[in-house]
């Protein structure tokens, strides 16, 4: 008995073709109204007299088990069809008007194309078709009539037939552009035997591949099929009116056991490559695709296919799939096209039952990445096992001010990060800052997946990007008396981990529409590092006592025997005796020393003078000293410093009795930091709310001396000249005349070259000192970085 492989039908059917395939007495499919029950098939010998077509009937009470008495023919197979409107099947194809007689007489076809899911295909058993297949098997598997139309098919459409050999199925004629193939009865027996030795694996439906892929949302990578079309597709043999009602995919409940391609999330790019259905079980083999004979299935997405579950618990649905057992073997899959290629028959009974069960969807890479981000997010200091180690290191650290010769590297700017890059270059050129961050170990993501100190981690990583500069070449003589020094900068890089801090710590600098300001960003960095170090200190001493931080012994500032209880005092307030036995009430914030305050932290004293009342003084910590340069009298940095400490009157001050009194205020420097950062306030806010830039030239020296008149009375005579003298090592410039835009660059002193470098994002070049202190009109100094000369 000859076995024939299934014939597949794709594409739109003309009215004539529709009548030839589905309406003629020898070839028709009659589908009664859907009853939601399991299906069965009547054999040819059971057909009533005078009835020349097969009728698909739906059982009502029970599933009809396979019977040995039923003849094995006509045989049926389960296959999957793609949307007939898919471009790869209709491109360049013309609908065949005439169908071979063998097909018209003996074949029954059904095609479901709602989605790329399982299809219903009937195998032919006619002698005429067998003769056609036998004649064409040696000629590449194409019939004579269809071979003439081969040029009209899409490129590469028949490429899968080239690999046919002795073990492959014999090709057959084409029906509406698709081929059928024939195997041997021996192969079917081998497939049936192979089925029995397969281990049980989690079953699945013929509706979807083992790795469910969403064919609706987009094309599958590495698949030859583009996105399928499902909007206007109609199942062959069904009326238009019942199409949407019968085949619309409903939303499955959570406990539904049915898996369809339309409801599964995308979890990969592979689909099942080789599988077969035999005796109600799905088989997979590495080298061949086999199909069971004699089964035609209907799908019911809501049908309960678990035999252990009561029927009353089965959820309602629309399309039914009768199934009772499936054994797919896990095999890497490629695409849905593999379901149609080189199909081989296998011996089986007419009925095939496929059991489907839901399996938890494999998490997508994006979902797992988000979970990793959550796990690698910020954690409290108490939950960070590495935090205590860093805290112990910071407690014993000694600040090193020795200059280090680093190989310069530019910073790539792919956004509006020039204000950040300029600030980072100045901090890298600061020796104590560099040594501090190099003192802290650099932990990898594996060693420290969770962190409580993102700011410290980022700057430790930044400083480790820079290494000692190689021995510089000897200066060479150029034209005239100029000495030209060559510089060999390292490769530029993009510090994305630094940029990410703006969003990780949720700084206001990350808000859209804000003007990027280098001074504001510097404050963001220094305050952030200071706060993280404070939190680490609390690990070592949770009950840390509040200590007043002052420049010098406490006994020099406070006379205990002259303290008076004013009734308004607090732990942070005391009376201080100044020159000429004048007393003042001094208040200060809770200062806790950290390595950052040890580098950049200075103190200013603000004294308020009021008639017939004691002076009131306040100590404040600063990282950058704000210098007002708006006055026309201010032309140099020294002028701005003198203006800072000048005594000013406060207008409109009244007492509790609402009497206006004369009040004045004066600011002095209480403590000078090792690294003094001067901020030239070039951006002035107007009363109307606008902002303008002061483009006036301000002269600044390389060596800056802080005069005694700028210091507080208690420390004027306690600082030597070398402790009040600073040397310039970095300048941050702002380019342009606009306050709402512009560009930032940095000049830094390179100790290895004993000269200056100009760094503009990733561009590094050598300049002379004159270009630093006398910039052109289009670039104005904005931040001046000085170091104390006694620490050089």
Curated annotation (Swiss-Prot):
Entry keyword Phosphoprotein: yes
Record-listed E.C. numbers: 3.4.19.12
Compartment(s) where it occurs, according to its Swiss-Prot or TrEMBL record: Cytoplasm; Nucleus; Early endosome
Location of region: G3BP1-binding: 6-21
Keywords tagged on the record: Acetylation, Autophagy, Cytoplasm, DNA damage, DNA repair, Endosome, Hydrolase, Nucleus, Phosphoprotein, Protease, Thiol protease, Ubl conjugation, Ubl conjugation pathway
Residues annotated as catalytic: 418 (nucleophile), 743 (proton acceptor)
Post-translational events: Phosphorylated by ATM following DNA damage, leading to stabilization and translocation it to the nucleus.
Region feature (Disordered): 126-164, 300-323, 350-369, 542-580
Entry's Gene Ontology cellular component terms: cytoplasm; cytosolic ribosome; early endosome; intermediate filament cytoskeleton; nucleoplasm; nucleus; protein-containing complex
GO molecular function, one term: cysteine-type endopeptidase activity
Record bears the keyword Cytoplasm: yes
Activity modulation: Specifically inhibited by spautin-1 (specific and potent autophagy inhibitor-1), a derivative of MBCQ that binds to USP10 and inhibits deubiquitinase activity. Regulated by PIK3C3/VPS34-containing complexes.
Modification Phosphothreonine occurs at: 24, 566
CDD domains found in the cross-reference section: Peptidase_C19
Modified residues annotated as N-acetylalanine in this record: 2
Annotated ranges, domain USP: 409-789
Assembly with partners or alone: Found in a deubiquitination complex with TANK, USP10 and ZC3H12A; this complex inhibits genotoxic stress- or interleukin-1-beta (IL1B)-mediated NF-kappa-B activation by promoting IKBKG or TRAF6 deubiquitination. Interacts with IKBKG; this interaction increases in response to DNA damage. Interacts with TANK; this interaction increases in response to DNA damage. Interacts with TRAF6; this interaction increases in response to DNA damage. Interacts with ZC3H12A; this interaction increases in response to DNA damage.
Summary of the function given for this chain in its UniProt record: Hydrolase that can remove conjugated ubiquitin from target proteins such as p53/TP53, RPS2/us5, RPS3/us3, RPS10/eS10, BECN1, SNX3 and CFTR. Acts as an essential regulator of p53/TP53 stability: in unstressed cells, specifically deubiquitinates p53/TP53 in the cytoplasm, leading to counteract MDM2 action and stabilize p53/TP53. Following DNA damage, translocates to the nucleus and deubiquitinates p53/TP53, leading to regulate the p53/TP53-dependent DNA damage response.
Protein family: Belongs to the peptidase C19 family. USP10 subfamily.
The name this protein goes by in its record: Ubiquitin carboxyl-terminal hydrolase 10
Organism this protein belongs to: Mus musculus
């Amino acid at each position: 008995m000859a076995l024939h492989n299934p014939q597949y039908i794709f594409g739109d059917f003309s009215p004539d073709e529709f009548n030839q395939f589905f309406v003629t007495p020898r070839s028709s499919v009659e589908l009664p109204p859907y009853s939601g029950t399991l299906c069965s098939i009547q054999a040819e010998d059971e057909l009533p007299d005078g009835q020349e077509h097969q009728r698909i009937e739906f059982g009502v009470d029970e599933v009809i088990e396979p019977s040995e008495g039923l003849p094995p023919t006509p045989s049926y197979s389960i296959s999957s069809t793609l949307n007939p409107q898919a471009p790869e099947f209709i491109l360049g194809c013309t609908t065949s008007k005439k169908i071979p007689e063998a097909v018209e007489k003996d074949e029954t076809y059904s095609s479901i194309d709602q989605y790329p899911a399982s299809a219903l295909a009937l195998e032919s058993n006619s002698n005429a078709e067998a003769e056609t297949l036998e004649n064409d098997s040696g000629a590449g598997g194409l019939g004579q009539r269809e071979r003439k139309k081969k040029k009209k098919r899409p490129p590469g459409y028949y490429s899968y037939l080239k690999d046919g050999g002795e073990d492959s199925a014999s090709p057959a004629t084409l029906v509406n552009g698709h081929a059928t193939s024939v195997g041997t009865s021996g192969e079917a027996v081998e497939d049936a035997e192979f089925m029995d030795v397969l281990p049980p694996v989690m079953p699945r439906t013929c509706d979807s591949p083992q790795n469910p892929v969403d064919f609706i949302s987009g094309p599958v990578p590495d698949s030859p099929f583009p996105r399928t079309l499902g909007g206007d597709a109609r199942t062959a043999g069904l009326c238009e009116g019942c199409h949407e009602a019968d085949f619309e995919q409903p939303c499955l409940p959570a406990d539904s056991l049915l898996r369809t391609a339309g409801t599964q999330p995308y979890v990969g790019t592979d689909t099942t490559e080789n599988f077969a259905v035999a005796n109600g079980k799905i088989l997979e083999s590495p080298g061949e695709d086999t199909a069971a004979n004699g089964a035609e299935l209907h799908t019911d997405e809501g049908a309960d296919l678990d035999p252990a579950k009561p029927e009353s618990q089965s959820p309602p649905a629309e399309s039914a799939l009768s199934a009772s057992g499936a054994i797919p073997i896990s095999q890497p899959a490629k695409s849905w096209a593999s379901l149609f290629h080189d199909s081989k028959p296998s011996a089986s009974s007419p009925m095939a039952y496929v059991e489907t069960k839901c399996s938890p969807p494999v998490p997508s890479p994006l979902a797992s990445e988000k979970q990793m981000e959550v796990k690698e997010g910020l954690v409290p200091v108490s939950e960070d096992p590495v935090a205590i180690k860093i805290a112990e290191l910071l407690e014993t650290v000694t600040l090193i001010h020795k200059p280090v010769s680093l190989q310069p590297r530019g910073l790539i700017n792919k956004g509006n990060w020039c204000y950040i890059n300029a600030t980072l270059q100045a901090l890298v050129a600061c020796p104590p800052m560099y040594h501090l961050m190099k003192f802290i170990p650099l932990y990898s993501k594996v060693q420290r997946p969770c962190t409580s100190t993102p700011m410290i981690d980022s700057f430790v990583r930044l400083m480790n990007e820079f290494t000692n500069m190689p021995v510089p070449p000897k200066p060479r003589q150029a034209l005239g008396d100029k000495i030209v020094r060559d510089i060999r900068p390292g490769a530029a890089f993009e510090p994305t981990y630094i940029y990410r801090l703006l969003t990780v710590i949720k700084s206001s600098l990350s808000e859209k529409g804000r003007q990027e300001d280098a001074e504001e960003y510097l404050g963001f960095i220094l305050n952030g590092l200071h706060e993280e170090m404070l939190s680490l200190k609390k690990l070592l001493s949770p009950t840390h006592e509040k200590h007043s931080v002052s420049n010098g012994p406490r006994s020099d500032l406070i006379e205990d025997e002259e303290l008076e209880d004013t009734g308004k005092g607090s732990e942070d307030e005391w009376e201080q005796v100044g020159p000429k036995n004048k007393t003042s009430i001094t208040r200060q914030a809770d200062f806790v020393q950290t390595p950052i305050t040890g580098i950049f932290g200075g103190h200013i004293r603000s004294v308020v003078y009021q008639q017939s009342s004691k002076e009131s003084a306040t100590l404040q910590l600063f990282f950058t000293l704000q210098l007002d340069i708006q006055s026309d009298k201010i032309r140099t940095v020294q002028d701005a410093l003198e203006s800072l400490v000048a005594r000013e009157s406060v207008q409109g001050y009244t007492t509790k009795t609402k009497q206006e009194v004369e009040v004045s205020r004066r600011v002095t420097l209480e403590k000078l930091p090792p690294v003094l950062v001067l901020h030239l306030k070039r951006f002035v806010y107007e009363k109307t709310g606008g902002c303008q830039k002061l483009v006036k030239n301000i002269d600044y020296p390389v060596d800056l001396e802080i005069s005694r008149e700028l210091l507080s009375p208690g420390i004027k005579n306690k600082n030597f000249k070398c402790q009040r003298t600073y040397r310039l090592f970095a300048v941050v410039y702002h380019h342009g005349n606009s306050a709402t835009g512009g560009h930032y660059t940095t000049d830094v002193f390179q100790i290895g070259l004993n000269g200056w470098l100009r760094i503009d994002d990733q561009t590094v070049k050598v300049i002379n000192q004159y270009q630093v202190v006398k910039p052109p009109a289009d670039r104005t100094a904005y931040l001046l970085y000085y170091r104390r000369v006694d620490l050089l």
